[in-house]
């Protein structure tokens, strides 16, 4: 029956005092082990209760169940120290069995459990509604834990966002990287300037700097003092075509075996005539050299003025040029030459005849370390510097530009000596100006040889002398007369034209090999600028005198066909640079193809130290 004072059910005849004594003793209290007082009390019957049991059929009053029901304890004001023993005591608490319902003590919290005989409907009806709330709360708590793990696993910048946010983050990261690169460049530049100031005012290390500078000047003055013994001996054994045989001296006497005193007067007269002849020849050479220098100065001024007056065109104007296919083709050839013949990452490069800086992006893709541009046209150098500072993305290499003649002036007088030696020297569509005289050509090769390190590379593009000979042999067209100028004839087409003011050579070689002048015209690019023929075999033999070995030589058209056919990456590069024919295939056709065939590419390697 239910006891309101204890808030639980108790069996008939149960003694409360005996049960409390059992709780205090901690033992099991069963009907079999009850005291006489308890048995006598248990045999008492209540007349009002219809359910009375005899002593033979009495069920045990208490029994431990193997499974304790789910509970909700309310500790109230009890502290943590007293709550733990109380919990253990509740685990040992016996449960009153009344019928088929299990009910806990009042001080044990609210237990809810049912026997196997209870129906599912009654379980659902009597189950506490708070159980559902607990299950929902646990499910939400688990979902929160999963979300927190997901937040910890992925950074906030890696989550899908709108394109504007990603662009802003990318720009921010790029700006941070550019700031680091700019800070590094500024530190390097400041350190470079500090060393230069120490060198100028004479610091502790100035003596070593000046001695090194003097040694460099001696190397330039001596022509090529770093050549090896084997190279020098091979050069002395080989006959260079640039060295012409000396003319016959008519005043020189015939060799005679007579040694009589009567022959002394004749020998003295012959020696006097020979000295007079040599003096006349020296005067003639001096006049010719002065005329050549005057012509070179006029030619240099024309070249300088032409490139200074050429306007700087934007990307849109260049794309609308009538020779855009030729420009794309030439840029592709230069890109392939730089990519395949240069040394690779971390180079220090000198560009002789840098112009407006059209090759800055090509060298940037090679990840060079330093770029030094030298050109005779001051306006072009200024435009090249502006192009470098406006490059997007910002360049990762240091660049400096100088206005000077890279062929006739020693580079050590133009560039700081600490920049030498360099890994690569490039001269794109400019080296033919150095073949105006032999002295200028040798000065150019001296700069190249003395500036390169061991195994350094000298590469460039020049007009093909074989194509010039073919054009002359095919017959020259008559030039239109013009007042104040002498014109002999020309060959070419609507895109380019090579015109001679004097009758060109008729044989298959240019003798003498220097000073063969012609006027070159290229549509929308070059307007009748004087240039000079570069006989390539003469150039190769002359370069061997300066420890430069030829490693590559290809005309433009052959080079394009070979690279596109054998290298898939080069074919993809040609597609990106839009080198297409009219039918959409790779290449160039029409008059622009003939103009591209006018040039060739070369590369030399520096031998020795």
Curated annotation (Swiss-Prot):
Biased composition (Low complexity): 268-278
Binding-site list for mRNA: 330-331
Region feature Disordered, mapped onto this chain: 1-299
Site (mRNA cap binding): 356, 362, 387, 432, 531, 599
Catalysis performed (reactions): a 5'-end (5'-triphosphoguanosine)-ribonucleoside in mRNA + S-adenosyl-L-methionine = a 5'-end (N(7)-methyl 5'-triphosphoguanosine)-ribonucleoside in mRNA + S-adenosyl-L-homocysteine
GO cellular component: nucleus
Binding site for S-adenosyl-L-methionine: 334, 353, 375, 405, 428, 433
GO biological-process terms attached to the record: 7-methylguanosine mRNA capping
EC number assigned by the record: 2.1.1.56
Keyword tRNA processing tagged: no
Domain mRNA cap 0 methyltransferase: 321-607
Extent of Basic and acidic residues compositional bias: 38-59, 88-104, 114-249
UniProt subcellular location: Nucleus
SUPFAM superfamilies with a match to the protein in the record: S-adenosyl-L-methionine-dependent methyltransferases (SSF53335)
Keyword set, alphabetical order: Methyltransferase, mRNA capping, mRNA processing, Nucleus, RNA-binding, S-adenosyl-L-methionine, Transferase
InterPro entries noted in UniProt: mRNA_G-N7_MeTrfase_dom (IPR004971), RG7MT1 (IPR039753), SAM-dependent_MTases_sf (IPR029063)
An example Gene Ontology molecular-function term: mRNA 5'-cap (guanine-N7-)-methyltransferase activity
Task performed by this protein: Responsible for methylating the 5'-cap structure of mRNAs.
Family recorded in the similarity comment: Belongs to the class I-like SAM-binding methyltransferase superfamily. mRNA cap 0 methyltransferase family.
Protein's name according to its UniProt entry: mRNA cap guanine-N(7) methyltransferase
Gene designation per UniProt: ABD1
